[in-house]
Amino acid sequence: MPIEMLSGFTANISMETQIQQNRRYTTIQLDIIHTGDCLEILKALPDDSVHCCVTSPPYYALRDYGMDAQIGRETTPKEYISRLTEVFTEVRRVLRPDGTLWLNISDTYAGKGNQGDFVDPKNPYGRNGQAVALNNKVEGCKPKDMIGIPWMLAFALRDTGWYLRNDIIWMKDNPMPESVKDRCARCYEHIFLFSKSKKYFFDYKAISEPIAPATAERLKRGMKGGNKYGKPVPGQPQPQSINRPREHGEIKDADINPLRNKRDVWKINTVPFKGGHYAAYPPKLVETCLLAGCPEGGIVLDPFMGSGTTGMVASQMGRHFVGIELNPEYTELAYKRIGGGI
């Protein structure tokens, strides 16, 4: 669907009425946050209408947002995965054929079935969404087992037709402290990259990284490992270089590409947020996803809008956003943040 068609609603019908009548919009309203159940609202959005989705659903059994129909407080991990699979099946329908999903998710440990301990007493809900201990027993898991939520979800989505393209590690130098003494403290979360189709939009150049100076020098000499010269040596493998070496094994500086493809470990620290949302991911994380997955002027969807980070970054980068948030207080918070009020 051409982007110029996505400028507003074709009928003056509220989202609530649209859902009640089981009707679907033929166009999509931009730069808006719909308040309500994400699954029901997604069902009212048109097919093939957004370029990408960047989101972080509530993690399993970590906190209670005090809302009916909230995701994350299911009795079992299987129920949690089932509900998210329903949501992302609708996301896949709403995405354009060349669209991508960037899904941030973290794991949880099984508890003992009694009152558990929070990791940081000063921040009982977590500074940055890092997983804390469960209080309830988990079927199929022993107490203290890591449940494996991220991969349970990744495989479930793959089974519904998504292409699982990347497991990106979001590494943090300032993770939430953990007082455990029988395992390493965790400092990372997962970002799964899914695509709707085999071929999809991915601007690898927009997120390319500088190569190391030593790598550039090695390429200039046309050397690989222990090979001494850039020119071929009889009886030895052809040396690696990014261009044909000159006669004495040198190539021009101008022939050196100073960039390399971005690696799948992203070092991005969390940032303080003074709003009343406990699990806001950093703007830099969203920026990287949008650079690669959403063209300028494109539309990004976030069905778990929270504090509005996705919408804020999209607006700053010349993209449009469509958000969904269950809690009306967070919707108000997100609008203020996107407008620069926070």
Which role does the model predict for each range below?
Residues 2-341:
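Core catalytic lobe of class I
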